[in-house]
Regions:
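Non-transmembrane "mature" sequence context
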Residues: 1-60
Length: 60
């Protein structure tokens, strides 16, 4: 979770904005909440991938 938090803070620049993103269903993640995907390593990688895409301006 620390890795995801660090990336999220880098992308959003604010813990409040990052938490809002974590708890909001995400179209690119199958309309799942990113927080719900952090239960296993596969989901964690999906969330990190989406944060990376957001950071580079690749939005779906």
């Amino acid at each position: 979770m620390a890795e995801v938090t660090n990336i999220g803070l880098e992308v959003f620049g604010d813990m409040g904005k990052f938490k809002l993103w974590l708890y909001t269903p995400n179209f690119a993640l199958g309309n799942l909440k990113p927080i719900d995907l952090l239960r296993d390593s596969y989901g964690k990688e999906m969330v990190i991938g989406e944060l990376t895409r957001i950071n580079y301006g690749i939005l779906l």
